[in-house]
A protein has these predicted regions:
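Mid-protein regulatory/catalytic core that forms ligand/cofactor-binding pockets
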Residues: 123-255
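Short boundary motifs at domain starts and secondary-structure transition points
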Residues: 15-16, 192-195, 316-321
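Generic detector of well-ordered alpha-helical segments enriched in charged/polar residues
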Residues: 27, 51-54, 135, 253, ...
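Nuclease-adjacent, charged terminal/linker segments that flank catalytic cores
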Residues: 1-128, 151
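Hydrophobic, Leu/Ile/Phe/Ala-enriched alpha-helical segments that form helix-helix packing faces
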Residues: 45, 53-61, 134-145, 224-233, ...
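General detector of folded, globular domains
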Residues: 87-110, 122-140, 191-193, 327-331, ...
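Short secondary-structure junctions
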Residues: 60-65, 144-148, 299-309
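Long, compositionally biased intrinsically disordered regions
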Residues: 203-210, 231-234, 238-389
Length: 389
């Protein structure tokens, strides 16, 4: 909804900035990201509704704070850039509205974005938009990403700092801990990290292009993140990353490009044992929620297979169960690093193979694995219901 206020045809509608509404989410994201790409509005909710809302907020409107009944008549948004780089920003005169979101939101914005200035060239801008999309995905999935609500990470002692619930920390906030972090993350593609009970994921966003990895830079970033996880979350090692992309076409392109790289240390599966590809759509939002359930891997395998057929990581290849002589592999988690190992074993070994997947993963898997593999689709809603998502 554009507003929680009553709407009478022919009359101007006042927009109420109510928690949970599209306008509240949009203001929250801009307060964290500075700008947001128009092409990715669908990540934040109904794309058609949000486009109409952005158009409306790009003209002078009256907005209302439901908690205090304070009113503000202002042009909230402006557009910048063209094509894929077209983005939404606040108008400077509207910045006080951040106080409606949280008392610390305005101060965070002004410190993070140089008092509402956006220096830098196209590469800097592209990184900003990657970060913005990533924030939008986490916020929509219910993963806390509001930096002003998260306890600050530190490197002085081994403490339990991170929240019990899943939380996303931006890479730019890693750099505030010590100046040395600046050099470790400056030239890598990492945009942040999710801390959840029992683990941590490095998070990347490749948007609509094949992921290109800075091999040694990513190793250094991983080492730095592992130290932060050890000092703040009780996590001793990190072997997993989440890779966001526009669609499964992006995942396929990334895998095919990776096949051309012969030096393992420059391939993403040489850096992280597990890479979970998450498309930036409603299916990806569901996948985010799955990946942050405590002990989700075991719960998922228990749901899919009886104990007597499971592999329990035994055997000559990556598979999850053996049923009637067929090796069954689950790709419900979107782990493309594990998928590479499965395909390599499948191509060099004889036997019957079956892959479990969600409906939206099937075309990508058919293209990557070839026509002779059996694909069995699983209803996403059923999995969510069984896991309590």
């Amino acid at each position: 909804m554009l507003s929680e206020s009553s709407c009478i045809p022919g009359f101007e509608t006042m927009i109420t900035v109510r928690p949970g509404s599209h306008v509240h989410r949009l203001i929250t994201v801009l307060g964290l990201a500075g700008e947001y790409p128009v092409r990715s509005l669908g990540v934040l909710g109904n794309e058609r509704t949000l486009r109409a809302l952005v158009s409306k907020l790009s003209t002078t409107q009256e907005l209302r704070n439901p908690d205090t009944d304070e009113r503000m008549r202002v042009k909230l948004l402006q557009m910048t850039g063209i094509g894929n780089a077209k983005a939404i920003r606040f108008c400077k005169g509207a910045l006080p509205i951040l106080e409606w979101i949280h008392p610390d939101a305005y101060g965070y914005y002004m410190a993070a974005f140089y008092n509402h200035r956006f220096p830098g060239g196209m590469a800097h801008r592209d990184r900003n938009l990657r970060v913005a999309e990533t924030i939008g995905m986490h916020l929509t999935a219910g993963i806390e990403t509001r930096a002003y609500l998260l306890p600050a990470l530190q490197n002085r002692a081994i403490l339990r700092i991170t929240p019990d619930a899943p939380a996303f920390y931006l890479a730019r906030d890693f750099k505030k801990i010590t100046p040395a972090e600046q050099n470790k993350t400056m030239f890598t593609r990492i945009v942040g990290a999710i801390f959840y009970p029992g683990g941590c994921y490095a998070v990347y966003n490749t948007r609509n292009a094949a992921m290109k990895w800075n091999g040694m830079g990513e190793f250094k970033a991983l080492h730095s993140l592992t130290e932060l996880a050890r000092m703040n979350a009780g996590v001793q090692s990190i072997d997993s990353a989440i890779l966001l992309g526009e669609s499964y076409d992006t995942a396929l392109t990334t895998l095919l490009e990776s096949d051309k790289i012969r030096r393992l240390e420059l391939r993403f599966d040489g850096i992280y044992r597990h890479i979970y590809f998450v498309p930036m759509n409603a299916g990806g939002i569901r996948q985010f929620r799955l990946l942050t359930v405590p002990d989700w891997k075991e719960k998922l395998l228990e749901l899919l297979f009886d104990p007597d057929v499971r592999s329990y990581n035994r055997g000559f290849m990556e598979y999850d169960a053996s049923i009637g002589g067929t090796c069954v592999f689950s790709h419900l988690d979107g782990d493309i690093a594990r998928l590479i190992r499965f395909r390599e074993a499948m191509q060099t070994g004889a036997g019957s193979f079956e892959v479990l997947c969600f409906d939206d993963q099937a075309p990508f898997l058919r293209e990557y694995l070839g026509p002779y593999i059996t694909l069995k689709t699983i209803d996403a809603a059923t999995v969510e219901a069984e896991l309590g998502l």
